[in-house]
A protein has these predicted regions:
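Walker A (P-loop) phosphate-binding motif
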Residues: 1-25
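Active-site catalytic microenvironments for nucleophilic, acid-base chemistry
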Residues: 22-28, 118, 200
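PAPS-dependent sulfation machinery
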Residues: 25, 30-109
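Short, conserved clusters of charged catalytic residues that mark active-site
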Residues: 3-4, 14, 84, 107-110, ...
Length: 335
């Protein structure tokens, strides 16, 4: 078993689930799917940690249930977050006889520096996709999935991509092991992309990594937005109607021009664009303030899940589910 983890990062709807499924086709790789224990880092702020950390983690995103790990298999005397991550993630990898352990999670998009500090020898794979396509996919997923309907998810995605790129470049300059790929290349030429990844993490290439046939996708959430990765073909859906609101589409284009100018055309990926406006000082300032406020709210939500009595959280979740079901019934009556 390797001493340091492998983390797979990318924005939501950018191909991280596909990449996870292909990576785990390798017999030596055993990544968890959106374990995200680091999101609940507040569990370990108290000296000695919280004894119910595993129960709260499982309540947060059913990570243990999805990976068929019994709650009593999680050690209760863990005092530090890195030790908790090692204990469970390595246990999961050992279950399939793998030596490469870690996690793929889009919710780590602004956690890169923190993960690198916690695991200095960790390796990172970052997948990029055209920001406009990321946001389109988020809006399509929101048609059926309530998580993507949260206010500001496309805004988080657009500016989270930029945050992740800045962190990625800075950490690479510091010598952190980061391998970058693009979604379109993965779909069009999975063999070349997966061979390069194998060279990066120093494992022999396995041809099974180029196909979804026989892939274990049991830990992936249900939902129509995961129908592609749960199918048998690596392909993107073409010729779909536009779903981006005109104003937000124009904003994405302005920022894409700005970021390509700043990177001399190397990032972000996507089709060639015509010359046009870039965002001004007021727009960039207000957008960044909005992004930071949203991420502060996300951090507060995670903090609440770490300390509020679980019974109260269960009652809140049941009430939220009932409200959603009632809203669905009302929507059906209006059709």
């Amino acid at each position: 078993m390797r001493s340091a983890p492998l983390f797979v990062l990318g924005m939501w709807r950018s191909g991280t689930s596909l990449l996870y499924a292909l990576l785990n086709q390798h017999p030596q790789i055993g990544l968890m799917y959106e374990g995200e224990l680091a999101v609940l880092r507040s569990l370990f702020w108290i000296p000695g940690g919280k004894s119910d950390w595993a129960q709260r983690w499982n309540f947060w995103n059913s990570a243990l249930d999805r990976h068929q790990i019994a709650l009593d298999q999680a050690p209760k005397d863990v005092r530090r977050l890195p030790d908790a991550i090692r204990s469970i993630y390595r246990q999961h990898a050992a279950g399939k006889g793998a030596t490469v352990w870690g996690c793929k999670s889009p919710n780590y998009y602004d956690f890169l520096p923190w993960l690198a500090e916690m695991f200095p020898a960790a390796q990172f794979i970052v997948i990029w996709r055209d920001p406009a396509d990321v946001c389109r996919s988020i809006l399509r997923a929101a048609e059926k999935d309530t998580w993507f309907r949260k206010r500001g998810v496309p805004h988080r995605a657009l500016f989270g991509l930029r945050r992740m790129k800045l962190d990625c470049d800075r950490l690479q300059q510091q010598g952190i092991a980061i391998h970058e790929i693009e979604y379109e290349e993965l779909v069009q030429n999975p063999s070349a992309v997966m061979k390069a990844i194998c060279a990066f993490i120093d494992v022999p290439f396995d041809p099974r990594m180029t196909s979804l046939e026989g892939a274990d996708r049991s830990a992936i959430y249900d939902g129509e937005h995961h129908s592609g990765v749960k199918g048998g073909k690596i392909a993107r859906k073409e010729n779909r109607p536009e779903v981006l609101p005109p104003a937000f589409k124009a904003k994405i284009e302005r920022y894409t021009r700005l970021w390509r100018r700043d990177s001399h055309g190397s990032w972000p990926p996507g089709p060639r664009m015509e010359e046009g406006n870039t965002p001004g000082w007021f727009e960039t300032t207000t957008d960044q303030l909005g992004f930071r406020a949203m991420r502060a709210f996300d951090a507060l939500t995670a903090f609440i899940y770490c300390f509020v009595p679980i019974r109260l959280l269960e009652n809140y979740r049941r009430a939220k589910t009932r409200n959603f079901e009632q809203q669905q019934k009302q929507d059906v009556r209006l059709l």
